[in-house]
A protein has these predicted regions:
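Membrane-interface transmembrane-helix boundary segments in multi-pass integral membrane proteins
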Residues: 33-37, 203-239, 258-264
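C-terminal TM-helix exit segments that contain a strictly Trp-centered aromatic cap at the helix terminus
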Residues: 88, 92, 130-139, 191-203
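Transmembrane-helix exit/juxtamembrane "anchor" motif
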Residues: 90-98, 233-255
Length: 284
């Protein structure tokens, strides 16, 4: 039984990658928009986020000659995650619409790519919210809106990022993320702490002032623990909102054949209730 349990918790199914993958096509549908409209909206967000990323990188390179630390900021890294997700999801959704809403490419791709996609979804529904909260609660200052560029870039990367996330959480059939994602998605956040101190060692500056032990002293540990706890809280809240959205939409569906959200809950939450069955054979 122990071996059976270990196999289950290390399986793709335990991380929300069912076989067949996403039979309800929840990742490419919405309770409010047609697949083609959803694909177009996701493509719009993909284009905007990509243009924002390129503009910020080019502007900082040309105007401030300070692009060397671009990938050292969690804001930029999480925003790149948004770019990747919206380009991937918009492509899958548009192809799904063009195929007559029968299937989409990711369903036939290797399972490792399916796993990476659902993990990416889980990260982009949590990290941008953390970025927004930390920036406006701790980092924002009088210089935030000092110039047009500063105002636009800060609003785009520290406010609109969460609006994009809310679009996915509230207006699509995706999610809720399984609890098994909470640790894998926390790993990049934890590893970023190392990136921040490597940046200080190699380039001589702290990406975020609250990570400087010489000025924050004991508060540094409190900030780190607070962000870790905040991550868990945001993950749980987002998961709860997605579950509630699925149940509410399912309840008010007029056509029972369209109850995609209900199927989504069954598929994404099966690991919470499914227990490995005890072997009746010779399996140890």
């Amino acid at each position: 039984m122990r071996l059976t349990g270990l196999r289950f918790f290390l399986s793709y199914e335990s991380f929300g990658v069912s076989s067949p993958f996403d039979p309800a096509c929840r990742l490419v549908t919405s309770p409010f928009f047609s697949p083609l409209t959803l694909g177009a909206l996701r493509l719009l967000l993909a284009v905007y986020s990509l243009v924002t990323t390129i503009t910020v990188l080019v502007f900082e390179s040309v105007r401030y000659h300070d692009a060397s630390g671009f990938l050292s900021y969690f804001t930029d890294l999480s925003y790149i995650g948004l770019v990747a997700y919206f380009w991937a999801s918009s492509t899958q959704t548009i192809v799904f619409a063009l195929r007559g809403q029968k299937s989409y490419p990711l369903q036939s791709w290797p399972r490792i790519l399916q796993l990476l996609h659902v993990l990416l979804y889980s990260t982009i529904t949590v990290f941008p919210i953390i970025v927004t909260v930390v920036f406006w609660a701790i980092l924002a200052s009088s210089s935030t809106f000092s110039t047009r560029y500063s105002a636009w870039s800060n609003v785009s990367q520290h406010a609109m990022n969460s609006i994009f996330v809310l679009f996915e959480i509230l207006l699509t059939n995706a999610g809720p993320s399984p609890w098994s994602h909470i640790i894998p998605c926390f790993v990049p956040l934890a590893c970023y702490l190392g990136v921040a101190y490597i940046t200080h060692a190699t380039q001589g500056f702290y990406t975020y002032s609250f990570l400087d032990p010489s000025t924050e002293h004991g508060l540094l540990a409190a900030y780190i623990i607070g962000i870790a706890v905040g991550y868990c809280v945001v993950f749980a809240i987002v998961r709860g909102i997605c579950t509630l959205r699925c149940r509410v939409v399912s309840r008010y569906r007029r056509d029972s054949s369209e109850q995609v959200p209900s199927e989504a809950i069954d598929e994404w939450e099966h690991i919470d209730s499914e227990q490995p069955k005890e072997s009746t054979g010779s399996e140890a």
